[in-house]
């Protein structure tokens, strides 16, 4: 097993993230202000402000492996994705986005928790064209306009290896042995999530990703 530091790509302070919304990890939007505590005006986020964007490079290798073989990649949650002291309220509102090899047509957006904060710490206050979003919608920016779409995020468990349950239902990436792949990592607060309220202010998390690789057609790590 090898470790590598995640290199931050954007210049946003990783110590202070603000609510944004996205459906594709390409276009993010924010609400610069509210009206009667409702987010009704939106603008495109410029220069990757308000969220974290980092990058690492991955290569599958192993003794006796050949370049014709393929390794399926999964997340390994044995060490937990965001450190052992992260507050659950932050996880409920956060999203982890992954883009492999620059292919933005296949973004992976993960929910880091399937729990919800107490009702007095939740709020649906995003309004688009006079309609309030429900808890399963996010904002899409296209051709200068903002619309509400279904939240594309999925549970992190769909891609995470669990020793007691075996391989997950989905594969992050099928990697050719020896080939180097880039991985762009996005960590942000989904502003349309009902859990994204003042209750998550001043909470911190350490972003650490572990991966589990299995040769295609085999069950070995």
Locate the predicted segments by residue:
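C-terminal, structured domain-capping segment
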Residues: 32-69, 74-80, 135-137, 142-221
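A surface/secretory-pathway sequence property marking extracellular, secreted
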Residues: 1-21, 80-160
């Amino acid at each position: 097993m090898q470790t590598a530091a995640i290199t931050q790509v954007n210049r946003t302070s990783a110590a202070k993230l603000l609510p944004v919304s996205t459906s594709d990890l390409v276009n993010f939007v924010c609400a610069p202000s509210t009206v009667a505590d409702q987010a009704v005006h939106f603008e495109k986020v410029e220069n990757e402000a308000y969220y974290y964007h980092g990058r690492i490079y991955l290569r599958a290798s192993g003794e006796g492996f050949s370049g014709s073989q393929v390794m399926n990649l999964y997340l390994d949650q044995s060490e937990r994705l965001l450190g052992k002291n992260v507050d659950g309220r932050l996880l409920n509102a956060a999203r982890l986005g992954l883009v492999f090899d620059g292919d933005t047509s296949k973004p992976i957006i993960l929910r880091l928790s399937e729990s919800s904060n107490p009702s007095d710490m939740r709020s649906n206050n995003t309004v688009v064209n006079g309609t309030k979003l429900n808890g399963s919608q996010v904002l899409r920016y296209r051709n200068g306009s903002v619309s509400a779409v279904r939240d594309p995020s999925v549970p992190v468990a769909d891609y995470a290896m669990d020793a007691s349950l075996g391989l997950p239902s989905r594969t992050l990436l099928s990697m050719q042995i020896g080939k180097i792949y880039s991985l762009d990592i996005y960590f942000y607060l989904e502003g349309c999530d009902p859990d994204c309220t003042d209750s998550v202010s001043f909470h911190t998390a350490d972003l650490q990703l572990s991966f589990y690789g299995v040769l295609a057609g085999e069950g070995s790590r």
